[in-house]
Amino acid sequence: MSERIAEVSRDTLETQIRVRINLDGQGKGQFDTGLPFLDHMLDQVARHGVVDLEIVAKGDLHIDAHHTVEDIGITLGQAMARALGDKKGIRRYGHAYVPLDEALSRVVVDFSGRPGLEYHVDYPRARIGDFDVDLFGEFFQGFVNHAAVTLHIDNLRGRNAHHVAETIFKAFGRALRMAAEPDPRMQGTTPSTKGSL
C-alpha cells in the first residue's frame, strides 16, 4: 500500500484552511484554529485515530465560529478522501464505544462513497467555555459530505458537556482508525461487491 498522506488547502472569503493528514502516522497533532476547545477535540482524533494531523485555520471569528468550524470539517473530509485513494485493501467499516466518567458515546463509520450523517447528541448545555456546541454538528456534516462517508454518532449518556464532546471525538478517531486500517486479507481488493466505492 502506498503512502496515505494528503494535504489540502481551502481558501474562501470567510476562511483560509490547511489540513495535512498521514493515515499511517503516530497520533501526532498540531492545531492552530483560533478555537482552543476545537483544537483539543481535534487532538483526540489524532491521538485515538493514530493519525498525524496538522490543521491551521484563519477564519472570520469576529462574526462567529460557524464558517471556521464547518470549513475545517470540509477540508478534513477532503484530505481523508484523498489520503484513502481508491480504498482498496481497507477494512471500510469502523466503530467505537468510548466512555469518560459518566459519559458514553458510540461512533460507526462506513467509507461507502455515500455521504450520510446520523447525529444524535443532546448536550446538557449550549456552550463549553466560549464554544457553541451546535457547531460540532456542522463540523461532522462538512466532513461527511466531502469524505463521502456514512457516519452515525450517538451519545448514549452524559451529564457533563465536555465529557460528551470528548467521548464523541475519541470514538470518531477510533472508528476512523478501524475503517481505514489495511486488511491483510483484502490486499488490492475493493471492499464492495460493486467493485468500487
From Swiss-Prot:
Gene3D superfamilies: Imidazole glycerol phosphate dehydratase, domain 1. This is Imidazoleglycerol-phosphate dehydratase. Its EC number is 4.2.1.19. It holds the Pfam family IGPD. Keywords: Amino-acid biosynthesis, Cytoplasm, Histidine biosynthesis, Lyase. It comes from Thioalkalivibrio sulfidiphilus (strain HL-EbGR7). One of its GO terms (molecular function) is imidazoleglycerol-phosphate dehydratase activity. It is found in: Cytoplasm. It is an enzyme of class 4 (lyase). Pathway: Amino-acid biosynthesis; L-histidine biosynthesis; L-histidine from 5-phospho-alpha-D-ribose 1-diphosphate: step 6/9. One of its GO terms (cellular component) is cytoplasm. InterPro entries: IGPD_sf (IPR038494), ImidazoleglycerolP_deHydtase (IPR000807), ImidazoleglycerP_deHydtase_CS (IPR020565), Ribosomal_Su5_D2-typ_SF (IPR020568). It catalyses: D-erythro-1-(imidazol-4-yl)glycerol 3-phosphate = 3-(imidazol-4-yl)-2-oxopropyl phosphate + H2O. The keyword Ribonucleoprotein does not apply. Belongs to the imidazoleglycerol-phosphate dehydratase family. GO terms for biological process: L-histidine biosynthetic process.
